Amino acid sequence: MTDISTGVQLKPGIGDGTVYNGNMSKDTLVNCSPDPENPEKGQASSPRTQISVDDNEESTTEYPSSWKLAMIMISLCLAVFCLALDTTIMATAIPKIADQFNSLNDVGWYGSAYLLTTSALTLSFGKLYSFYSIKWVYLQALGMFEIGSLICGATPNSLGLIIGRAIAGSGSAGIYSGSMLIVARSAPLERRPLLTGILGGLFGVASVVGPLIGGAFTDNLSWRWCFYINLPLGAVTGLFLILFFDGAKATTQRATIRDQLSQLDLLGSLCFLPAIICVLLALQWGGTTYPWHDGRIIALFTVFGVLLLAFAGVQWWRQEKATVPPRLIANRNVWGAALFSFCLNASFIIFTYYLPMWFQSIKGVTATQSGIMNLPMVLAVVIFSIISGGLVGALGYYTPFMVIAPLIAAIGAGLLSTLRMDSNNASWIGYQILYGVGVGCGLQQPIVAVQGSLAPADLPTGTVIVMFMQTIGGAIFMSVGQNVFQNQLMRNLATQAPSVDAARVLQAGATMLRKTVSSDLLPAALRAYNSAITEAFYVAVAMAVLALPGALVMQWISVKGRQL
């Protein structure tokens, strides 16, 4: 079969709606082609149905040697470490940055600029990875991230820092999903769960140690090193990939410039990018900077809704040339994995941000100590990401881990929501471990699922859809958690400690709470703070539970080539 738009020869099952298990036994595909007369076809309604065709692409694929794969994994680990570090390293540096630039009003934009561009551009990188060389698109994304980091480190003012964060976020949009695609091009399917588990575990570690490293740089060197650290690590990543990763040839090598622009779905991007920016700004400003009924918040949500409908219409119209082809969204493995990623990461991000806050405010520890006390959850996530990845490779099936992960995580999250001022060490350590086991078992399985059920030509788009949902889930529920916490804290202080200045408590933050409130009012203020944080934990419990439906719709496809 020939792709008319590019003139590139495609094998059966590649780009024709067939869902492909990249490491199935020879010549075996799962037929998920759309059938207009029976919508259930294309969803692989019978998980035992198999169709034999002549396709041995996986068996003829040449993967890098073991030592080359090791070098590639080192480079990807460094890139993912930098990426995760950049999301949290500023937490302890912001006070000194605000003091140096006299920019307290800009503090919110230091995180938002990075988050907005990352979320808005993630899907666009899916098209780039689909039609151009994965290696060179990835290196360009890495270059953008490095340029943004350099600007942040060298900037003389607050505006430069915001611009640098936006540029770095643009690059980060393609790094994590690109790392997963490089793994897919570098190892057979049965080895990918372990490798993606390593990357996912490292991401969790870097997210939590970020504030610790940021504090060390800020106190002993300069806050600028929070960004300069990315430069040598990124350089090593780029060098290793150039030397050891061959990459894939661009599928547009025979296409004209006009055809390439058509494939990039510029109209869809023009609808989607501002839509994401609108909803994230509305969630960040709503209930904090402006009340929810403010005209600006209502306008942002309205524009988001209109643009989202327009984007959906463009995707339906463009079909295979769309950023998100409807054929893939109709595939239950894709939308199930996307829903699972959205919900589980939404739950995880709330605990990543608010559990250290509980330690700092209720237990009265420093930011560094809170990071250490958060290690039980982090280590559990890392260890069980790797263990579950290894077990998937050995047993063949990822679906059982996707089913048990939200159940364990929901139990752990529920127990964490019971934390009180007098909770002992055994409680908060044990609850964290249980929750971390659940998250670790499930966090990377959606990537394995889409890579095990889609044709090679669909891997970039499928992977990026899942990564986008994971990113946007964290972005949205970071704001949701903040709103729940702040609104509940204001109500609690009004009823339990009415003489405490609530606005001053919010501005002081968790570490300064005990210095802001007088000793006679401190117990009541701490009770109000504890209740507000655990209210945010309830949101995390709900999202962990909501991840389960995404797991239940997944096919039982084996990465070892068997299907139940």
From Swiss-Prot:
This is MFS-type transporter astH. Disruption phenotype: Does not affect the production of astellolides. Its main location: membrane. Induction: Expression is regulated by the secondary metabolite regulator cclA. Keywords: Glycoprotein, Membrane, Transmembrane, Transmembrane helix, Transport. CDD domains: MFS_Azr1_MDR_like. Belongs to the major facilitator superfamily. TCR/Tet family. Pfam families: MFS_1. Residues 26-59 are annotated as: Disordered. GO terms for molecular function: transmembrane transporter activity. The keyword Transport applies. GO terms for cellular component: plasma membrane. The chain crosses the membrane at residues 69-89, 106-126, 143-163, 197-217, 225-245, 266-286, 297-317, 339-359, 375-395, 396-416, 461-481, 537-557. MFS-type transporter; part of the gene cluster that mediates the biosynthesis of astellolides, drimane-type sesquiterpene esters that show antimicrobial, anti-inflammatory, and anti-tumor activities. Seems not to be involved in astellolides translocation. Residues 43-53 have a biased composition (Polar residues).
